[in-house]
C-alpha cells in the first residue's frame, strides 16, 4: 500500500506479538501528520484482517519491555559543530519540567516506565550517552564523532 508515508524501518520487539515501525526522517509538522495517518492505517489494516492492534503501554503484563512511542529529534544547533553542548542544554531544559511532560504521555505509563527493561521510571528524569535506561538516550556515535554531521 502506498500511503505516502516515510516508513524507514520495522523490527520485532521483546513482548510477544510486539512490533515497531519507524517513520522518518521527516520534518515538522509533517511528522505529526504521518504518525496520525500511520496509526489510523494500523487500526484499519488490523480490522481488515480481524486482528487487534493497540497502543496500550503494556497490554500483556509480565517481565518484559512495554511499548511506547519514542522519537529522535534535533535542532539546527544540535547538528552543527559543538552540537553536543546544545543537546545537553536541551536535555537540561526538558528535565526542569519533566513531571509536567510525563503527565501528557497517556494512561498506563507507570506500567511501562518502571525503571526496568531499558526504561527510566516515570517519576525520574535522566539523560546519558548510550544509556538505554535513561529518559533521553544520546547516541554513542553522536558523542564520539568529530562532528554531529558525521553521525
Each language-model region and where it sits:
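Glycine-rich anion/phosphate-binding loop at the beta-strand->alpha-helix junction
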Residues: 30, 35-141
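Active-site acidic/histidine clusters and adjacent loop/turn architecture
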Residues: 1-36
Amino acid at each position: 500500500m502506498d500511503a505516502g508515508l516515510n516508513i524507514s524501518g520495522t523490527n520485532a520487539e521483546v513482548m510477544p506479538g510486539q512490533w515497531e515501525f519507524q517513520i522518518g526522517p521527516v520534518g515538522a509538522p509533517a511528522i505529526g501528520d504521518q504518525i496520525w495517518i500511520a496509526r489510523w492505517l494500523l487500526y484499519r489494516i488490523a480490522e481488515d484482517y480481524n486482528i487487534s492492534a493497540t497502543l496500550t503501554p503494556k497490554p500483556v503484563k509480565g517481565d518484559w519491555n512495554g511499548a511506547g512511542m519514542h522519537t529522535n529529534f534535533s535542532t539546527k544547533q544540535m547538528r552543527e559543530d559543538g552540537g553536543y553542548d546544545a543537546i545537553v542544554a536541551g536535555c537540561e531544559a526538558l528535565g526542569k519540567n519533566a513531571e509536567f511532560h510525563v503527565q501528557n504521555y497517556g494512561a498506563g505509563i507507570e506500567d511501562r516506565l518502571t525503571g526496568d527493561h531499558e526504561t527510566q521510571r516515570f517519576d525520574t528524569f535522566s539523560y546519558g550517552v548510550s544509556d538505554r535506561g535513561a529518559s533521553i538516550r544520546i547516541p554513542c556515535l553522536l558523542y564520539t564523532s568529530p562532528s554531529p554531521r558525521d553521525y
